């Protein structure tokens, strides 16, 4: 019984809208209350009630090394002693920028910001400023943060709470957002046939992670690249989730597709608030102060986040991505077999160190098919796994994450818990 968590949640609801600072954390999508965390280490979360959970959420993606990795925490401790914010450039900004540029094929220059939302909204402004066009192609169910242009048919918490858009976003703002189903290249071609001369950019999660995990079909990303080249539009890869996760060089390295602009977040801050956007030099040089497209931030390039990011990328650069992916692949096959043995419809999508359990018999290739999965079955699964110390995303529209800190025993514990689930 999570008594202290319940007490804190009740108090939080009097002070914070919904009791949380990001909607999906409220656990409304799984008919539960949130757990309040006291500390975390490795693959474990420890609650204010003294409970311990094996964490398959990883703070929604940043903790690929696990919680409180010693090299990352040492770097942050050292940075704190040097000052928490300067409002001026520091050496670590240059060091982290160089690491990002070296790792990602599509990034010649990079600008640090404070969140993935800042990164995507800044990249869109830059794309519009560079091309002189206004329209944006995005995909139904993909989530690119909570900036106004991206909230049309978005995924993540918007999907979890069944919000079709959001009040407060003028129709005039989303009028320039053109929608297509994810993985549907023909639909994108139709949009370009109608609006090609006005489209500034396509923004896409190269691997969708906010409608649950949905990998791109063969030829989909290549087709987007070709359409942008044909029509003079920019291709923006939202790699806030996939950057440094699906390979050290992100989805663009894994799939061999070079975008014009890339947005980053999560992993590059090692768990501290951070975001970034980068791309081709000729495009990035249009950003102020060397260009006319304005973007700024008081805490951008924060020394604590830069130190954490440097340490995180240093460790990841020598980590065994292939080994982790092989372990996750074998684990997912066994998990799927266990759940199918219980007589429920189930498909598990997986790529690299991510997976999503969809309770459906049909392939999940876009948001429409993701929504056909049985939400009640997911809620039951979530509750029973949580009761056994397994912490999964409190939403059927989020990806589960495995970190380098997860041991074979951790994965075995999840499988054992799944065997005890009843439907």
Swiss-Prot record:
It catalyses: (S)-4-amino-5-oxopentanoate = 5-aminolevulinate. It holds the Pfam family Aminotran_3. One of its GO terms (cellular component) is cytoplasm. Belongs to the class-III pyridoxal-phosphate-dependent aminotransferase family. HemL subfamily. Its EC number is 5.4.3.8. SUPFAM superfamilies: PLP-dependent transferases. It comes from Nitratidesulfovibrio vulgaris (strain DP4) (Desulfovibrio vulgaris). Transmembrane segments: none annotated. Its cofactor is pyridoxal 5'-phosphate. Pathway: Porphyrin-containing compound metabolism; protoporphyrin-IX biosynthesis; 5-aminolevulinate from L-glutamyl-tRNA(Glu): step 2/2. HAMAP family: HemL_aminotrans_3. Disulfide bonds: none annotated. NCBIfam families: hemL (TIGR00713), PRK00062.1 (NF000818). Gene3D superfamilies: Aspartate Aminotransferase, domain 1, Type I PLP-dependent aspartate aminotransferase-like (Major domain). One of its GO terms (biological process) is protoporphyrinogen IX biosynthetic process. Keywords: Cytoplasm, Isomerase, Porphyrin biosynthesis, Pyridoxal phosphate. The modification N6-(pyridoxal phosphate)lysine is found at residue 266. This is Glutamate-1-semialdehyde 2,1-aminomutase. It is found in: Cytoplasm. CDD domains: OAT_like. Homodimer. GO terms for molecular function: glutamate-1-semialdehyde 2,1-aminomutase activity; pyridoxal phosphate binding; transaminase activity.
């Amino acid at each position: 019984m999570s008594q202290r968590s319940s007490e804190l949640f009740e108090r939080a609801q009097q002070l914070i809208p919904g009791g949380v600072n990001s909607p999906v954390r409220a656990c409304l999508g799984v008919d539960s209350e949130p757990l309040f965390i006291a500390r975390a280490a490795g693959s474990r979360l420890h609650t204010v009630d003294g409970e311990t959970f094996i964490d398959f959420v990883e703070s929604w993606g940043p903790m690929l090394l696990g919680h409180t990795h010693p090299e990352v925490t040492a770097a942050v401790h050292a940075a704190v002693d040097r000052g928490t914010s300067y409002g001026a450039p520091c050496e670590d900004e240059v060091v982290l920028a160089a690491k990002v540029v070296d790792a990602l094929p599509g990034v010649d220059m990079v600008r640090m910001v404070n969140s993935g939302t800042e990164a995507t909204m800044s990249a869109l402004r830059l794309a519009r400023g560079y091309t002189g066009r206004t329209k944006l192609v995005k995909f139904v169910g993909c989530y690119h943060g909570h900036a106004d242009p991206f909230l049309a048919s978005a995924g993540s918490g918007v999907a979890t709470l069944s919000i079709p858009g959001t009040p407060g976003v003028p129709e005039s703002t989303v009028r320039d957002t053109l929608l297509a189903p994810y993985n549907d290249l023909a639909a994108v071609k139709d949009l370009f046939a109608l609006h090609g001369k006005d489209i500034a950019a396509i923004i896409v999660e190269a691997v969708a992670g906010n409608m649950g995990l949905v990998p791109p079909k063969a030829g989909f990303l290549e087709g987007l690249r070709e359409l942008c080249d044909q029509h003079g539009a920019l291709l923006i890869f939202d790699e806030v989730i996939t950057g440094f996760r699906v390979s050290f060089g992100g989805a663009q390295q894994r799939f061999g597709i070079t975008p014009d602009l890339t947005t980053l977040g999560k992993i590059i801050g090692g768990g501290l608030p951070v975001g970034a956007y980068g791309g081709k030099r000729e495009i990035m040089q249009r950003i102020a102060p060397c260009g006319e497209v304005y973007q700024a931030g008081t805490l951008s390039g924060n020394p604590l986040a830069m130190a954490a990011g440097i340490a995180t990328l240093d460790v990841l650069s020598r980590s065994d991505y292939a080994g982790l992916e092989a372990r996750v692949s074998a684990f997912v096959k066994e998990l799927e077999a266990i759940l199918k043995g219980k007589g429920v419809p189930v498909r598990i999508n997986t790529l690299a160190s991510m997976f999503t359990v969809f309770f459906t018999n049909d392939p999940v290739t876009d948001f429409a098919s993701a929504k056909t999965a049985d939400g009640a079955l997911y809620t039951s699964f979530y509750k029973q796994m949580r009761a056994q110390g397994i912490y999964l995303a409190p939403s059927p529209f989020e990806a589960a994450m495995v970190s380098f800190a997860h041991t074979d025993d951790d994965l075995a514990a999840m499988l054992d818990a799944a065997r005890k689930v009843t439907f």
